[in-house]
Amino acid sequence: MEEFVRQCFNPMIVELAEKAMKEYGEDRKIETNKFAAICTHLEVCFMYSDFHFINEQGESIIVELDDPNALLKHRFEIIEGRDRTMAWTVVNSICNTTGAEKPKFLPDLYDYKENRFIEIGVTRREVHIYYLEKANKIKSEKTHIHIFSFTGEEMATKADYTLDEESRARIKTRLFTIRQEMASRGLWDSFRQSERGEETIEERFEITGTMRRLADQSLPPNFSCLENFRAYVDGFEPNGYIEGKLSQMSKEVNAKIEPFLKTTPRPIKLPDGPPCSQRSKFLLMDALKLSIEDPSHEGEGIPLYDAIKCMRTFFGWKEPYVVKPHDKGINPNYLLSWKQLLAELQDIENEEKIPRTKNMKKTSQLKWALGENMAPEKVDFDDCRDISDLKQYDSDEPELRSLSSWIQNEFNKACELTDSIWIELDEIGEDVAPIEHIASMRRNYFTAEVSQCRATEYIMKGVYINTALLNASCAAMDDFQLIPMISKCRTKEGRRKTNLYGFIIKGRSHLRNDTDVVNFVSMEFSLTDPRLEPHKWEKYCVLEIGDMLLRSAIGQVSRPMFLYVRTNGTSKIKMKWGMEMRRCLLQSLQQIESMIEAESSVKEKDMTKEFFENKSETWPIGESPKGVEEGSIGKVCRTLLAKSVFNSLYASPQLEGFSAESRKLLLVVQALRDNLEPGTFDLGGLYEAIEECLINDPWVLLNASWFNSFLTHALR
């Protein structure tokens, strides 16, 4: 074959092909078919460009080389055949002068008439298969693809063949001649069968010196050098090999690897049952705040003082009554607990000096609500050794719940903007080194996008409640301490605001281990009528406690004010994580940064400013039954933040399991989208693992529903 190449092709082409193979560390004497393929490709590129010029009027003309007018501008810039550094220099220069988008891979030609890069393909296989491989590798609509075959077929982007019929016929004739010459020498079959699919790695990294010796030393047994190992890996067909290995390991294991196709995956099955209910530690979209602006009262900053001041802003209190009972609870006790709280707050106000903290009287209703004396008595294991039928008590299987629309509404609300600013600019850590000015610029842009987001309010509320509850749990272990649920923010005009959402009363809290539970009763204000979505409020007893005057378009309207009361519990470890909810800001900032980095590496400059300031550009936010939802960069920031915050608010073993297992399916689907031909075994087992996490948790059910939307659109 090498001899044929030297006879058949122009010496300049042969020399360029030798250089190219040397640059990629390939041996022309061993890889003779590749040598022939490179020469053929080079010749087609040169023939494509030959005789094509642009005249002074900017029109494309064909001129034979001995014509005196041959000083005209060449229509095509040849990039193929140059060494890599030079080729990229040419590409960059073209991009700078013409404004063309820089390609990710080195193209073969640039067409000055059509102002586009061209990728030339010469294939021994079907043209459309090779075309799709090229298109999939390049992933750019800006680069024009033109494929020729040795059988006279061709294919080009949008059937735009660039050249006139005669020029293309010359190329096809030459390819047909090469094929016939090879066939007459008995070389064609080997050459035809040796074509491999389009490689997506555009350059082979050459390892030399110490690193090369280390690589040779660290090979698996039976491999003498890195090249042999590379050849083995390149030609490795994993599926049959893995099946064989598995069957050797155990007679029970029988893993038949099945191809994963567009029709393979089915939707995740969501459970049937009554609708799921709200399980967050505090109200989210339904919360109501009693607020004071520019607080300057005595003791400002002391929670109890702030709470009393906020309570005084409301004048519509009325005799409370139960509007939505808690099915399993003693509802009069919840009502009595609220009345007790009001009475004890009144007592404080009547005192000369308001105390810094308030411990509630241990009344029967609070003892019941806080589970006092309800825990089974702990017995030392040594005292039970002799009991023959000792066993752990049976616990009921959790009841399956179905997805309900309220959790999607909660998420949508969390992504929205409020009319207050919840974090200062310095909330997300400080710069450590001067090199981080880009980091601080990104952080400031990001903070500006999320500082008014409702998810950010949830962060600050969560941090406050968990900090206060953990402090009280340690400082007043035996007391039923009253903890106001407070947050602080600024108005858009910069005025400070203190907000009261309601109160928590904590139970006994002798927390030795991280997982020991402290019970608490939460009482939270709201304007949401629980009768609209009773299933959401299954765990709550809801009282009507007053009437609030609200400004509306038609003047002042009176709306009933509700109090959502429930018994809840948390642990040291949960409170510790709750106190660190600000991490959600950091996590979503890092996700945004990776988007900016990807954009910057394509454009080869920092794109932070353009990323945040180009308001016209939209970005993918997520999947919905309608398709891929898009929005502004601010919306993307807020959506990512809301996801992170909900992962914290609704943290659970179900979420951990679903995230870990569904990720495996996601990776397989993404591999399919990238045409990597993935194979799977025991896909049914993976679905089982995913679906056993779908029990009753609203956030997990919503994520599963989103995942199904993604599957639908990803596999179209």
Curated annotation (Swiss-Prot):
Phosphorylated on serines and threonines by host kinases, including human casein kinase II. Keywords: Cap snatching, Endonuclease, Eukaryotic host gene expression shutoff by virus, Eukaryotic host transcription shutoff by virus, Host cytoplasm, Host gene expression shutoff by virus, Host nucleus, Host-virus interaction, Hydrolase, Inhibition of host RNA polymerase II by virus, Manganese, Metal-binding, Nuclease, Phosphoprotein. Its cofactor is Mn(2+). It holds the Pfam family Flu_PA. A motif (Nuclear localization signal 1 (NLS1)) lies at residues 124-139. GO terms for biological process: cap snatching; DNA-templated transcription; symbiont-mediated suppression of host gene expression; symbiont-mediated suppression of host mRNA transcription via inhibition of RNA polymerase II activity; viral RNA genome replication; viral translational frameshifting. Its EC number is 3.1.-.-. Gene3D superfamilies: Influenza RNA-dependent RNA polymerase subunit PA, endonuclease domain. Belongs to the influenza viruses PA family. Influenza RNA polymerase is composed of three subunits: PB1, PB2 and PA. Interacts (via C-terminus) with PB1 (via N-terminus). This is Polymerase acidic protein. It comes from Influenza A virus (strain A/Leningrad/134/17/1957 H2N2).
